[in-house]
Amino acid sequence: MNLSIQDELQLFSEELYHHLTPSLLDKLAKELGFVKRKRKFSGNELATICIWVSQRTASNSLVRLCSQLHAATGTLMSPEGLNKRFDGKAVEFLKYIFSVLWKSKLCETSAISSATFMYFQRIRILDATIFQVPKHLAHAYPGSGGCAQTAGIKIQLEYDLHSGQFLNFQVGPGKNNDKTFGTECLVTLRPGDLCIRDLGYFSLEDLDQMDQRGVYYISRLKLNHTVYMKNPSPKYFRNGTVKKQPQYTQVDLEYLMNTLKPGQTYEIKEAYIGKDQKLFSRVVIYRLTEKQLQERRTKQSYTESKKGITYSKKSKRLTGINIYVTNTPWGIVPMEQIHDFYSLRWQIEIIFKTWKSLFQIHQWQNIKQERLECHVYGRLIAIFLCSSTMFKMRQLLLHKRKRELSEYKAIGMIQDHLFLLFQAIQKNIQAITKIFIRLFTLLKKNGRKSHRYEKKTVFDIMGVIYEYSGFKKQQKVA
């Protein structure tokens, strides 16, 4: 059924309203023990201050927070009284709301149509972001060590690039291991998924599990793993019989790197990775351009000086190449497209960038643990609301107007309308729908993605058909 824009936004509004009505929040606060008797500061007031009206719950003064609460709801609180309300039950309340939201059906109708969707039901992007917290919280949130931080929070996120649906999520200490979380995510895999993983999540065991479950993967290869290829030139005795020798030989990656030109791609056919545990896979090598090489060297120097991490001599020698392993069929993703497909992973970096630059999730004063956690989960709820709205608008603009939405621009514009959305939720579904229609009109006018330097966008790589503006309107097919 081809619904109108208003009809689709009304269905989206109904799902949102179902989770965030004032009466539901107050009822939930009683069920979770945040409120034990009738009080002026209940679940809706806590949600108001942490989600809707203050994005600096951890850094603004308590006096300022009381002022913002009074301006939004008319509730009068003392700074001491408000600080007491930031307790363990408040954290549990906000954490529960966030958990229900990201597991909800908000993004079920936000998937876009693309050429890749014919082969990959979901494109799963997994990564983590980390930020420092007050040192006195090191017992609860130990950092990653080294000279980088003594206390920190790491947030792990895996989401579907087609729909924006959050698939796996974790808030934990900065020292948490990425690879362990990556393994835990395997239980949510479905046949036909495509997992794109970076080096922090690399595991031969996990990749083998994906292959056995009918799941595709594209991953960077850690350089401490050896690549073997089928012996291309067996040696013979004079009588023509083959000399006894290994069927596979070790690949000299440094030699291979030096034979490639910048920007060139090469595939090692009939290869496997690992000495003890063998993973038979396509191995694709991409030689970085000079610009990419300089960026990598700059990043390595920063990492060594700021985070206390030392790269091995082998890693430094092989800085000029990316080595990818994948089980995607060559006919669907040829070697020339592997690097582009892997670059889809960088979309999650844009999402994490908004968390800090727009939502200030990493900003705090020297405060107690419960208030910091209320800030984090309040920001995560606001982030999810803006993110899910953005993905819905992206789907509508593509389906109805054949346009590509800029994720970063859109999330900023949606955030600007959060307080209007808060006011609408206090009323009814129709009021929420009106705000979303206003947002759609704004994003249609000002939210188009810029096409700079002829770089491929997400839609280009995924094979989405859409219109873009040059000197004249054209239809772009990746």
Swiss-Prot record:
GO terms for molecular function: DNA binding; transposase activity. This is Transposase for insertion sequence element IS231D. It comes from Bacillus thuringiensis subsp. finitimus. PANTHER family: TRANSPOSASE INSL FOR INSERTION SEQUENCE ELEMENT IS186A-RELATED (PTHR33258:SF1). NCBIfam families: transpos_IS4_1 (NF033592). It comes from the Bacteria. Keywords: DNA recombination, DNA-binding, Transposable element, Transposition. InterPro entries: RNaseH-like_sf, Transpos_IS4, Transposase_11. Involved in the transposition of the insertion sequence. GO terms for biological process: DNA transposition. Belongs to the transposase 11 family. The keyword DNA-binding applies. The keyword Transferase does not apply. The lineage of its organism: Bacteria, Bacillati, Bacillota, Bacilli, Bacillales.
